């Protein structure tokens, strides 16, 4: 890795900051929503109540001796952080720890009636079945009239913005983008991305998924298009091995999304059928590596995952959390070169992300100045700006 100055690791110890608000407000709200969405029994509800107290007022308590992943979490820093306030350990670590403890509270890992039951599934399905999803899927029919390269770019736009990619993933905002004082897309390496997926020769794409539901659907549409038009020969979709960060995609969520597409009419149904066929013949593979839920940056990835990424023509990492893990969850100066902080990555990498946390690299100085002048610091966390960054 190039010799770049170290930036402070983000912790959530300062009231009024975005990370502090996540631990102090968002996590308790998630616990209350989980208890409301699913009729858990008294044991699970007591455990959720205890977690609410612990995550806001208590300290990191190690997993029970019999936990199936205790050794893994010990290697990931559990014992080193034991006894410390959740606000005093790295923010990425405390967030990941919260979701591991939530699953422990609802009996997700233990033998019994709640084993394997996703506590976030009601919210995921509600989004996938929402009328807005019907409208977006119906709008796919209009893409059939576009040339292939325009269709591909529209689908990339949809994958970038997820459920903010309104009106069927159309690129209708492009003209406004070019004249806006502060563009929604604060960094755009999309031409470099397409140069890696030009089909000469066609190779493999790794896509590290972010959210399920209406955000996973456009990821799957993009993969289906790239396969159908020979831009890639196969795709590997990395999902989470268990529920994580409320909406992160698991294998079950992929199957739900494919079923949703297949049941639709028109172009959406055709995409769904192609995806089913690709899963069946191996052109689309699913991976659920344990490190996908690690509280660590990708710089610490194990060798087998490193090999997966090294063998791909391009690895696309979706979403804010994957970006934090890709560049390191630190207060980087926004103009820190993206290529420098990702130099360790074993192959070409592309980040597609809407901005929902303080971590940002690779901005032009004039872009940072314009953003700060127009919005103060809100642009970092509001989700109204996005980026496409590529390192080859």
Predicted regions and their residues:
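Conserved structured core elements
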Residues: 21, 92, 187, 216-220, ...
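C-terminal functional extensions of proteins
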Residues: 2-4, 11, 239-241, 248-392
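Histidine-anchored nucleotide/phosphate-binding helix
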Residues: 214-236
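Gly/Ser/Thr-rich loops at beta-strand to alpha-helix junctions
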Residues: 89-93, 208-217, 242-244, 320-325
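N-terminal beta1-alpha1-beta2 submodule of the flavodoxin-like/Rossmannoid cofactor-binding fold
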Residues: 227, 240-243
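Non-catalytic accessory regions outside enzyme or core folds
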Residues: 1-191, 195-202, 385-392
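Residues at the starts of beta-strands that form the adenosine-phosphate
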Residues: 203-204, 232-236, 348
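Structural motif
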Residues: 204-206, 313-314
């Amino acid at each position: 890795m190039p010799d770049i100055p170290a930036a402070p690791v983000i912790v959530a110890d300062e009231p009024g900051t975005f990370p502090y608000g996540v631990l102090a407000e968002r996590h308790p709200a998630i616990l209350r929503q989980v208890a409301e969405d699913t009729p858990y029994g008294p044991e699970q509800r007591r455990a959720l109540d205890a977690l609410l107290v612990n995550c806001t007022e208590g300290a990191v308590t190690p997993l029970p001796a019999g936990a199936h992943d205790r050794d893994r979490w010990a290697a990931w820093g559990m014992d080193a952080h034991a006894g410390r306030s959740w606000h005093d350990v790295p923010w990425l670590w405390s967030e990941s720890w919260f979701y591991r403890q939530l699953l422990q509270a609802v009996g997700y890992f233990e033998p019994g009636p709640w084993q394997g039951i996703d506590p976030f599934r009601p919210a995921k399905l509600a989004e996938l079945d929402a009328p807005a999803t019907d409208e977006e899927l119906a709008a796919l029919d209009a893409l059939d009239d576009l040339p292939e390269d325009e269709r591909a770019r529209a689908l990339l736009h949809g994958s970038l913005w997820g459920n903010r990619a309104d009106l069927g993933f159309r690129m209708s905002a492009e003209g406004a983008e070019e004249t806006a004082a502060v563009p929604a897309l604060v960094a755009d390496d999309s031409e470099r991305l397409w140069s890696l997926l030009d089909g000469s020769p066609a190779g493999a794409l790794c896509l590290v998924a972010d959210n399920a539901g209406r955000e996973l659907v456009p990821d799957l549409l993009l993969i289906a298009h790239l396969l159908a038009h020979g831009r890639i020969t196969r795709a590997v979709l990395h999902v989470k091995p268990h529920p994580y960060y409320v909406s992160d995609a698991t294998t079950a969520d992929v199957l739900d999304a494919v079923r949703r597409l297949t049941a639709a009419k028109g172009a959406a149904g055709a995409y769904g059928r192609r995806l089913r066929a690709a899963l069946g013949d191996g052109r689309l593979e699913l991976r659920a590596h344990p490190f996908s839920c690690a509280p660590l940056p990708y710089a610490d990835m194990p060798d087998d995952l490193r090999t997966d990424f090294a063998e791909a023509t391009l690895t696309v990492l979706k979403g804010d959390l994957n970006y934090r893990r890709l560049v390191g969850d630190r207060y980087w100066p926004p103009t820190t070169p993206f290529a420098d902080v990702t130099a360790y990555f074993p192959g070409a990498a592309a980040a597609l992300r809407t901005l929902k946390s303080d971590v940002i690299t690779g901005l032009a100085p004039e872009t940072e100045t314009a953003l700060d002048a127009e919005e103060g610091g809100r642009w970092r966390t509001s989700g109204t700006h996005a980026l496409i960054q590529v390192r080859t």
